[in-house]
Amino acid sequence: MATSMLGSVRGPRPFGLANLFHRQPPRDAWERVRRLPGPSAVRRSVAAASGPGIPGSHLYCLELLRKRDYESYLCSLLFPAECQRSASALRAFNVELAQVKDSVSEKTIGLMRMQFWKKAVEDMYCDNPPHQPVAIELWKAVKKHNLTKRWLMRIIDEREKNLDDKAYRSMQELENYAENTQGSLLYLTLEVLGVKDLHADHAASHIGKAQGIVTCLRATPYHSSRRQVFLPMDVCVQHGVSQEDFLRRNQDKNVRDVVYDIASQAHLHLKHARSFHRSVPAEAFPAFLQTVSLEDYLKKIQRVDFDIFHPSLQQKNMLLPLSLYIQSWRKRY
């Protein structure tokens, strides 16, 4: 039997995730969601937009998000109008760094790209950003919100260390990586929203860890197709599972137990972040809209009994825009 912080269970293993809908959404909710910019509108705007720096740099970021991080793209559209541009710049910056590892054939090239971004961030704080769309938009966000350079550099440093194709040695190591990347990104997002609050920071830390864990799980089928496994080794050893089991897409119970334990840890971080939501300023809630997609994935993997390779886990949730809008309207996370 799988044993995690949720305890031993038999048969279907419920997380006990809270129901998303406690109140009736506004009657025109779907109409409002339909008015969000669609892919074609973004592409037309990219071609037509102009502004200081590089013409269309903001909409370049939106298009990058739409293609590479659709959930963040949707979330950025639900930020307060005065924060949308900066929020999308931060997320586009994260995408630029995240795709380095998968887009280079040699670690040396990856290190060179990370060095470019380190210098770019240093130059932003000297009002001399490189002529690159994401860098231009990030520079504007830095100037507008006085963003903390330490968080930006910490994301780059952690992504750089992660260029090695090695599995996480432990769950703690995965959580540290998530805190230094996703957590730092959320701290910056709170700065964009003008939120300075210890409870909000505490929630950001737990949600960032949940995001990192879920991202690791979601990417496992892709990584296994490239003969790579990054799931925490200590959890695998505990259940007698080898990397080869994941490469062969083994669906034995002990493999599912590994996935269950890892998913349980993400659920616990979400649960803890939500346990003190009444102490978090409502102004911080847009930063935490991603909890909708995290909860959606955890529910889906629970329904397939933690079969991480089940085809349904790779399908887009067509109701995600509506769910995000309702969560935004409810001012909950």
Swiss-Prot record:
Chief subcellular site? Answer: mitochondrion
Entry GO CC: mitochondrial inner membrane; mitochondrion
InterPro entries, per the entry: Isoprenoid_synthase_dom_sf, Squ/phyt_synthse
The UniProt keywords, alphabetically, are:
Membrane, Mitochondrion, Mitochondrion inner membrane, Transit peptide
Domain of life of the source = Eukaryota
- Membrane is among the record's keywords: yes
Residues of the signal peptide: none
Q: Where is the transit peptide?
A: 1-44
| One of the GO BP terms on file | mitochondrial respiratory chain complex I assembly
Q: Give a short account of what the protein does.
A: Involved in the assembly of mitochondrial NADH:ubiquinone oxidoreductase complex (complex I) at early stages. May play a role in the biogenesis of complex I subunit MT-ND1.
The record's family statement is: Belongs to the NDUFAF6 family.
Q: Which PANTHER family match?
A: NADH DEHYDROGENASE (UBIQUINONE) COMPLEX I, ASSEMBLY FACTOR 6, PTHR21181
Designated name of the protein: NADH dehydrogenase (ubiquinone) complex I, assembly factor 6
What high-level taxonomic lineage is stated for the organism? Eukaryota, Metazoa, Chordata, Craniata, Vertebrata
